[in-house]
Amino acid sequence: MKKSLLGIATSLIVLPTLSYADSPYFSFKDGDGFKRFSASIGWLHAMPQGKANNVNVNTSIAEGTTAKVGEVSKDAVLNAAVKDSNPLLYGALQLLPLETLPSGLSGTSTINGLSNWQADGTGLEADDVDTVGMMLNYHFTDHVSLEVKAGIPPKVDIKGKGDIYAPLSGSADTPLGSIDLKKDIHITDLTQGGKAASVRAWLPAAELHYQFGKSGVNKFRPYVGVGVMYAYFNDVKLNSGIESDLVAAGHMIQNIHDGQAGAALDGKTSSADPRVKVKTTDTFAPIATLGATYDFNENWFAAGSVSYSKMNNEAKISVTDNNTGKELGGVLKSMLTLNEAIIDVKES
């Protein structure tokens, strides 16, 4: 049985090789009046065209969560309380000769608005980038070729847009009465530091080209191409200021879980060890190219092209408690549209 399987496997590998050897389309020999292989190397400039999309934010605090408040500064309560919902209680809190309300007086809170929301006016945009690109072509005929293109993976700066606020709402129930809560808690400024993050981009592509004109006759030969691009991103580095802000937000969420909602309002550290992680999704996308070559002689040519590829890519920033592995919250997502302009010169 093993011998038979080996024979079948050998046949599958060898027979196609033998059959392609005599094909006019699959050969290592030059074609009739044209070269079978060509290579070019040069400048590659990528210009992302997509606009920033509002980021979605989620936390582990479900709608209607009831949590003990614990100790809390009076100023934090007054800043979050809706005065018109209970003017008498609001006035009484103002008159209390205390800077900090003890847990026996702060009571409990019912929390809404933190489970999931969209941060309006925010987003992430990739900056323009330059790198060295290489294009390899296999010519089936003088007009049809398969091109594989890639470049040295560049570092791409991701610019942030807007501020993220957490839309806290709910109510506080104290021994003195109840009062509504409503406060937009500032989480982070995505524009701080000039860039929100940096990422290394791998963007190989394969295209089928049709080239007009004829080798040896027309020096200038335009071409069109369609194919597929694969986008892979790694080595993601988040802005340190944004990372610190998200760690603080993680402490806020954990304080609510710990029955210390007042500490969350006061921005105190919690029992958690928040860590920020960034993940991006890989994606395939169609790509279209318009370009031209100019032959200087039999072996040297110049080529220039413009490619367009629309891709939808997601980036997720999560905050996890390193002590328990529990996710406290996450920020997602960014969608990018990529447009590449390519100029290259190399021996064919």
Task: Indicate where each model-derived feature is located.
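Outer-membrane beta-barrel architecture
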Residues: 32-40, 131-133, 145, 199-205, ...
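Residues on the lipid-exposed face of transmembrane beta-strands in outer-membrane beta-barrel proteins
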Residues: 41, 134-142, 204-212, 226-230, ...
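A mature extracytoplasmic/lumenal domain signature
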Residues: 45, 150-152, 306-308
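Substrate-binding/catalytic groove segments of enzymes
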Residues: 216-218, 294-303, 312-317
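Outer-membrane beta-barrel channels and translocator barrels
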Residues: 34, 141, 153, 213-217, ...
